[in-house]
Amino acid sequence: MELSVHIENKIKKSLNTVNSNIELSKGLPNKFYTSEEIFEYEKETVFSDNWCGIAFGSDIPDVGDIKALEFLSIPLIVVRTEKEQIQVFENVCRHRGMILVEESVKNKKHIRCPYHNWCYGIDGKLLSTPHVGGIGNHNHEDIKKNDLGLNEIRSHIWNDTI
C-alpha cells in the first residue's frame, strides 16, 4: 500500500498543475502515459471495481463469431452464441492454460485448444477431452467436464458496448 500512497501523491501533485488556471497549467508528464508503475496503480484504482467497455456487439454480428482481445493483460474472447447471446470468457484452456483463439474468427461452432485438442462449445462448455484417459480413451473419472468449462467473465451490453 505504501507504493500506492507514493503514486497517489505524485498524481495529485501533477493534477494540480493540469487543473491550474489556464495560463499556469501544464500537461501531465510523459511518464504518466508510459510508466508501468502508474498503469498498475490505475488498474487497481480505476478499472478493478468499475465496468469497462471492451468491445461492441457489432464486432461479432453473427452466431459463431469470436473476438479475441486482451484487457488489462487478461486474454479474453467475446462470443456470439447459438442463442444469439453475447458472452465473455477467459481465452485460456482449462487444461494447461494455452491461449485458445489467437485472432478474431467468424462462424465457429467450437473452440479447440491447439495444445491437447480439448474442445469447447461457443457457449464455453467443455465438450471433449481427447485421450485424457490414455490413447483412445476420451474420458477419465477425475475429469468432470461440467466443472471445466471456460471461465465466464460477467458482462453486460449497453448501447452495443460490451
What are these regions (language model features)?
Residues N21-I22, L28-F71, L76:
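Non-catalytic accessory segments flanking enzyme active sites
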Residues I60-I162:
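Rieske [2Fe-2S] iron-sulfur-binding domain
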